[in-house]
C-alpha cells in the first residue's frame, strides 16, 4: 500500500485528526500512477538531490525517496511535520524542514545534503495561490537547479510554456523561458485530489538553459520592458510603452528611434514578439537612454 492510496490517505488524516487549511492551498494527490509519472518525468535516480515544496502527508515524497540520493521537503504547515515523521519513518534520506520556502535561506540548507555537489532538481505539487512567486523565487535564487518538474494549475502551466502569438503568452512566459525551457508534460484531472480543486492541473517540466535564452545588456530592464509591453494586452506596443515611459515629445522621439532600430512596428502587440525581439527592443530603448 502507498501513502497516496485513497484508503491510506483517509486513514492517515483520520488518525492524526487533520483538517485542511484553505489558506495553505492544500490538495493531496491520491493517484499512484500519476505520482509514478511525475518521478519518471523528473528522471530521478540516486545521483540526484531533490527539493520538494509542500509534501503534505508524503505521497510524492515516498516515490522520490525511493529513487533519489536525498529529499529535502519544505512544509509550511507545522501540523504536517509529525504526520510526515509517521508516514516516512522508513526512509533515512528524507529531511523535512518546517519553513516557508519564500523566507528560508535555501543556499544554506542545500549545504546540509550529504553530497551537495550532486545535481538538484525541484519536484513539487505547488500550492495554486502562490505558484508564480515560488517559481520565480527559486529560478532567480542563483542556486543552479538543473530541472523543475512541478504540478500547478493548468492555466498557469500554459502561460509559462506559451509561445508568441498565442493567448497565453505574456511576461510570465518570458520571465521563465529566459532561464529555462518549459514544456507541459501531462495533464492531471481535478478528480484525483483530496479535497478536489476547482480546476485541472498540469505537470510542467522546466530545464535550465546553460546560458540565458538571449543576451541582453541589462536583465532587469529587459524584464521591465517585457512586462510593460503586456500592461494592456489589446493595446499596441506604442501605447503600452508610452504608458510606461511617458508621453512627452522627447520620450516619443526616443521610442520611435528605438523601435526603428529594433525593426519593430509601433502598431505591433507585445504578444507577437519573441524573446529575441524583446531583447533587441530592450537594448535599443536602453541605448536611447530610456
UniProtKB/Swiss-Prot annotation:
Its EC number is 2.1.1.182. The keyword Protein biosynthesis does not apply. GO terms for molecular function: 16S rRNA (adenine(1518)-N(6)/adenine(1519)-N(6))-dimethyltransferase activity; RNA binding; rRNA (adenine-N6,N6-)-dimethyltransferase activity. It catalyses: adenosine(1518)/adenosine(1519) in 16S rRNA + 4 S-adenosyl-L-methionine = N(6)-dimethyladenosine(1518)/N(6)-dimethyladenosine(1519) in 16S rRNA + 4 S-adenosyl-L-homocysteine + 4 H(+). S-adenosyl-L-methionine binds at residues 27, 29, 54, 75, 100, 125. Keywords: Cytoplasm, Methyltransferase, RNA-binding, rRNA processing, S-adenosyl-L-methionine, Transferase. One of its GO terms (cellular component) is cytosol. GO terms for biological process: rRNA methylation. SMART domains: rADc (SM00650). It is found in: Cytoplasm. Its main location: cytoplasm. Coiled coil: none annotated. It holds the Pfam family RrnaAD. Transmembrane segments: none annotated. Belongs to the class I-like SAM-binding methyltransferase superfamily. rRNA adenine N(6)-methyltransferase family. RsmA subfamily. Specifically dimethylates two adjacent adenosines (A1518 and A1519) in the loop of a conserved hairpin near the 3'-end of 16S rRNA in the 30S particle. May play a critical role in biogenesis of 30S subunits. This is Ribosomal RNA small subunit methyltransferase A. It comes from Streptococcus pneumoniae (strain ATCC BAA-255 / R6).
Amino acid at each position: 500500500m502507498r501513502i497516496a492510496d485513497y484508503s491510506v490517505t483517509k486513514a492517515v488524516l483520520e488518525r492524526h485528526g487533520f483538517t485542511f487549511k484553505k489558506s495553505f492551498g492544500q490538495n493531496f494527490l491520491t493517484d499512484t500512477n500519476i505520482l509514478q509519472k511525475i518521478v519518471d518525468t523528473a528522471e530521478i535516480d540516486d545521483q540526484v538531490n531533490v527539493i520538494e515544496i509542500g509534501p503534505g502527508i508524503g505521497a510524492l515524497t515516498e516515490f522520490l525517496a525511493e529513487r533519489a540520493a536525498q529529499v529535502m521537503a519544505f512544509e509550511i504547515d507545522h501540523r504536517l511535520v509529525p504526520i510526515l515523521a509517521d508516514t516516512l519513518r522508513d526512509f533515512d534520506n528524507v529531511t523535512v524542514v518546517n519553513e516557508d520556502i519564500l523566507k528560508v535561506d535555501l543556499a544554506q540548507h542545500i549545504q546540509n545534503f550529504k553530497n551537495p555537489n550532486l545535481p538538484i532538481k525541484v519536484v513539487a505539487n505547488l500550492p495554486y495561490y502562490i505558484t508564480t512567486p515560488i517559481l520565480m523565487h527559486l529560478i532567480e535564487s542563483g542556486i543552479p537547479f538543473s530541472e523543475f518538474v512541478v504540478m500547478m494549475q493548468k492555466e498557469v502551466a500554459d502561460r509559462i510554456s506559451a509561445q508568441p502569438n498565442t493567448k497565453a503568452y505574456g511576461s510570465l512566459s518570458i520571465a521563465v523561458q529566459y532561464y529555462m525551457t518549459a514544456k507541459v508534460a501531462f495533464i492531471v484531472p481535478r478528480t484525483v485530489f483530496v479535497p478536489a480543486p476547482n480546476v485541472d492541473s498540469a505537470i510542467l517540466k522546466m530545464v535550465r538553459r546553460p546560458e540565458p535564452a538571449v543576451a541582453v545588456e541589462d536583465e532587469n530592464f529587459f524584464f521591465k520592458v517585457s512586462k510593460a509591453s503586456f500592461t494592456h494586452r489589446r493595446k499596441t506596443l506604442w501605447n503600452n510603452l508610452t504608458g510606461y515611459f511617458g508621453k512627452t515629445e522627447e520620450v516619443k522621439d526616443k521610442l520611435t528611434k528605438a523601435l526603428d532600430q529594433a525593426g519593430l512596428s509601433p502598431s505591433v502587440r507585445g504578444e507577437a514578439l519573441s524573446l529575441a525581439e524583446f531583447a533587441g527592443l530592450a537594448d535599443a530603448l536602453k541605448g536611447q537612454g530610456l
